[in-house]
Amino acid sequence: MVEFTHISDGRAQMVDISAKPDVVREAVAQGRIYLRPATLAAIREGSVVKGNVLATARVAATLAVKDTPRIIPMCHTIPLGAVTVDFTEGDGYIEATVVTKSTGKTGVEMEALTGVSVALLTIWDMVKSAEKDENGQYPVTCIEGIRVVEKKKGQ
């Protein structure tokens, strides 16, 4: 049977990490947002009415990484050493990659995942008017594949 460290007697609780040593940690998370070709072109050309989409998404992701413990209840507040946010355009999508680094008592994967999620949501928010069809729906727009692609500890 799987043991969950965040549950004790059926109650949610924050795990006690106070006795753990500080260790260098890094996490890399990625995810994609699928968009219409015209929307991708507008982002590339810098012609989106709301402004620079990727610059805004980069700032939003960084802020989200720093605020992760405020929105995920059992996530510890950790000293972040670095956050990098990059975007790659593929065939019909933009991929966000967030790298988080810390020297602390617990991992930084939740921060990286939160950063990717908010980056992609910010992109959606900035281009939603271009993505809607005549019925106000989003037939192409899709966020998927949010995952941790790498986690390092002690290097």
Swiss-Prot record:
This is Probable cyclic pyranopterin monophosphate synthase. It comes from Methanoregula boonei (strain DSM 21154 / JCM 14090 / 6A8). Belongs to the MoaC family. HAMAP family: MoaC_A. Gene3D superfamilies: Molybdopterin cofactor biosynthesis C (MoaC) domain (3.30.70.640). Catalyzes the conversion of (8S)-3',8-cyclo-7,8-dihydroguanosine 5'-triphosphate to cyclic pyranopterin monophosphate (cPMP). Keywords: Lyase, Molybdenum cofactor biosynthesis. It catalyses: (8S)-3',8-cyclo-7,8-dihydroguanosine 5'-triphosphate = cyclic pyranopterin phosphate + diphosphate. GO terms for biological process: Mo-molybdopterin cofactor biosynthetic process. InterPro entries: Mo_CF_biosynth-C_arc, MoaC, MoaC_sf, Mopterin_CF_biosynth-C_dom. The keyword Lipoprotein does not apply.
